[in-house]
């Protein structure tokens, strides 16, 4: 087998080299060190496919990612050292719902309705149809696997699938913060093989049942058939969209009609196993070849954990060890998923480091060790008041519902906020409430105090996004979620101001007040304009132009006002699966058109970074800097990679023209995050882009489109 793999690898080598360039591999920030080990990670939404890919007798780790900008399948070779080799890309297609099965010591890889029975030899080149359609009403997850469910020696098909219809997606809290949508559902069932293994004939698909109803977990079931309690029959073990695993004991007297006990949590040391992140993809396999079943689990940020089985006796549950992340020889710098870097000399040693957030809600410091190209340390999680910083939405602080409980979406901006000469951190999150961490240490040894709110001198109650069910405390600044702040002395008075996407999606300036107001911020002022309102005025979370004309008057509704004079938002009409517009109180439908109002002339060219409602809101990240050195501030904002918004205003007016993407690479999934600074110490600022795959893409000026470098 090894010879076959070598031949296949050689045949792919030239293609892979081209594919890597196409997907930005050459722009990923590298550790540039041979002595370093880090967590093994690949892309977004890790789906592990453990198998002996190179035929050397041990299991390698293959990881599939369907997320942008690093889709495809990566091979982490296990050379027996306990540390995996760096990822090698062996497929570049965006494959959702890929799985692995182990049948009679044979590896079969599946996609919905497709089997690759000789994957180790031929990869995805020889698909075979599985004559079994997917279940109706599945969303996101539809996972085919093979197993002998009934013990008759014939291989059956099991399918796990998610159903999001009851959950919906966003904006479903009542005024007390209770989610009024339903839960996610993750169902599992099987199609019995009534033919032979050579010529299978599958019975109609049937859901697995427990003594209390259908097998149902919280989305993303990733089902595994395994004798978990070693009592001689096949049990069912599942993952979930959140952070837990569930097993269902087989209690049916008739193997041809399996019935399971209600689900019980998989436990470690007597407590339910909880993973660090969510969107779990579970594979039950004997990773260490010691004769028992271990668990290999992928999570949203592209990393994979091993939950080792320490052994168990017949009729007992496994003694599981705590989860441990697979490790690899360090190659490319990765910071979770949706990396949101900022560039700063954090430790005062003269070179520029990185402070980044991610979906998991951590803040991480990536130290620059110097050199050109720079060498890097692995990310270190920052602490405040002696505790690791982590924001999480919990059951009701994500507008998209409780399925996002373990996400935090931290987006830091590092600046000297209190004027003491030390870099502090301001931070937005999944919640949208702006906080800051005071640096109480020294220039060489930063030490952060616990988070405290940024204070605004509001004359009345603080505004908030209209879809938030909760109200800010007096003085709080609550803006749209998942947006990056700019901290800059905009009016040149010696005090650091704040620029943010406000609670209605407009870019706003929050001026810093003097000592008589205890250096609070003034309420936001919408002073930022676009050079061409018709083409540049309103965007969505990915930076794309956003327009809708629900009343047919030929004008973009999102640049108008409702009859009551309020801004309008793009939103979903769930009942009819369409987009419409609304203000804070009223949804406007095309079958009942009403005239909208034109805003005052001074507001018609305002830069509205996002015109979306609720889950469509926010997600805009930006840097404000004089990129082209013409004496005017420019904006760099997220887009297909990032866009340069060149400052064109005169006499101090803040006017910007969208020059388009700064690179030809497609880096966006939901959004990207820009940072600007001199990482290699050559005296020239470079562009760094954090992407949804968690990798950081580094662009010295010579690698960018010329028209986005010079005016």
Where does each model-flagged region fall?
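Sec-dependent signal peptide recognition
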Residues: 2-8
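Short, linear, compositionally biased motifs with a strong N-terminal bias
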Residues: 10-12
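Beta-propeller-forming repeat regions
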Residues: 15-711
């Amino acid at each position: 087998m090894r010879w076959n793999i070598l031949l296949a690898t050689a045949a792919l080598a030239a293609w892979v080299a081209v594919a890597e360039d196409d997907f930005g591999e050459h722009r990923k920030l590298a550790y540039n060190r041979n002595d370093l080990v880090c967590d093994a990670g690949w892309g977004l939404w890790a789906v592990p496919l453990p198998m002996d890919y190179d035929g050397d007798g041990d299991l390698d780790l293959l990881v599939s990612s369907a997320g942008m900008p690093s889709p495809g399948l990566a091979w982490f070779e296990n050379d027996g050292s306990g540390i995996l080799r760096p990822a090698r890309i062996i497929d570049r297609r965006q494959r959702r719902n890929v799985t692995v099965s182990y049948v009679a010591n044979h590896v079969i890889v599946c996609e919905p309705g497709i089997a690759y029975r000789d994957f180790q030899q031929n990869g995805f080149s020889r698909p075979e149809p599985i004559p079994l359609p997917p279940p109706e009403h599945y969303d996101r997850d539809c996972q085919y696997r093979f197993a002998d469910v009934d013990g008759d020696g014939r291989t059956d098909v099991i399918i796990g699938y998610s159903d999001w219809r009851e959950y919906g997606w966003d904006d479903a809290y009542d005024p007390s913060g209770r989610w009024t949508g339903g839960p996610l559902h993750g169902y599992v069932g099987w199609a019995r093989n009534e033919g032979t293994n050579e010529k299978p004939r599958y019975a109609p698909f049937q859901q697995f049942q427990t003594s209390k109803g259908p097998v149902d977990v919280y989305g993303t079931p990733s089902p595994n058939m395994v004798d978990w309690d070693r009592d001689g029959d096949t049990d069912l073990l599942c993952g979930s969209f959140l952070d837990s695993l569930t097993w269902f004991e087989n209690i049916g007297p008739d193997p041809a009609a399996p019935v399971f006990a209600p689900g019980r949590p998989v436990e470690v040391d007597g407590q339910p196993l909880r993973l660090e992140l969510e969107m779990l993809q579970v594979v039950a396999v004997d990773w260490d070849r010691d004769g028992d079943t271990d668990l290999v689990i992928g999570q949203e940020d592209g990393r994979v954990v091993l939950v080792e089985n320490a052994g168990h006796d017949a009729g007992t549950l496994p003694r599981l060890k705590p989860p441990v992340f697979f490790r690899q020889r360090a190659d490319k710098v990765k910071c979770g998923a949706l990396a949101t870097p900022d560039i700063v000399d954090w430790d005062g040693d003269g070179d520029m480091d990185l402070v980044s957030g991610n979906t998991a809600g951590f803040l991480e410091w990536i130290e620059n060790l110097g050199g050109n190209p720079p060498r890097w340390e692995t990310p270190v999680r920052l602490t405040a008041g002696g505790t690791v910083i982590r924001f999480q939405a919990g059951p009701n602080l994500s507008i998209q519902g409780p399925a996002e409980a373990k996400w935090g979406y931290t987006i830091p901006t590092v600046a000297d906020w209190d004027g003491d000469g030390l870099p502090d951190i301001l931070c937005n999150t999944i919640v949208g409430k702006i906080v800051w961490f005071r640096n109480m240490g020294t220039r060489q040894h930063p030490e952060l105090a616990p988070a405290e709110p940024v204070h605004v001198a509001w004359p009345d109650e603080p505004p908030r996004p209209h879809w938030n069910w909760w109200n800010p405390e007096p003085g709080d600044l609550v803006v749209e979620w998942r947006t990056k702040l700019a901290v800059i002395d905009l009016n040149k008075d010696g005090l650091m101001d704040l620029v943010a996407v406000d609670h209605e999606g407009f870019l706003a300036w929050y001026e810093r007040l003097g000592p008589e107001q205890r250096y609070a911020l003034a309420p936001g002022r919408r002073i930022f304009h676009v050079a061409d309102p018709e083409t540049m005025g309103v965007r969505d979370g990915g930076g794309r132009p956003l327009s809708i004309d629900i009343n047919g008057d030929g004008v973009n509704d999102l640049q108008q006002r409702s009859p009551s004079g309020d801004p309008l938002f793009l939103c979903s009409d769930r009942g009819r699966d369409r987009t419409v517009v609304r203000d804070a109180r009223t949804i406007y439908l095309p079958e009942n058109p009403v005239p909208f109002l034109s805003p005052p002339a001074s507001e018609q060219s305002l830069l509205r970074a996002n015109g979306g409602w609720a889950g469509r809101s926010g997600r805009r990240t930006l840097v404000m800097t004089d990129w082209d050195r013409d004496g005017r501030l420019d904006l760099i904002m997220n887009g297909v990679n990032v866009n340069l918004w060149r400052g064109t205003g005169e006499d101090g007016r803040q006017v910007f023209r969208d020059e388009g993407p700064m690179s030809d690479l497609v880096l966006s999934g939901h959004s990207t995050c820009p940072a600007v600074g001199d990482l290699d110490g050559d005296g020239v600022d470079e562009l760094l882009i954090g992407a949804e795959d968690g990798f950081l893409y580094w662009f010295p000026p010579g690698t960018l489109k010329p028209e986005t470098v010079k005016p």
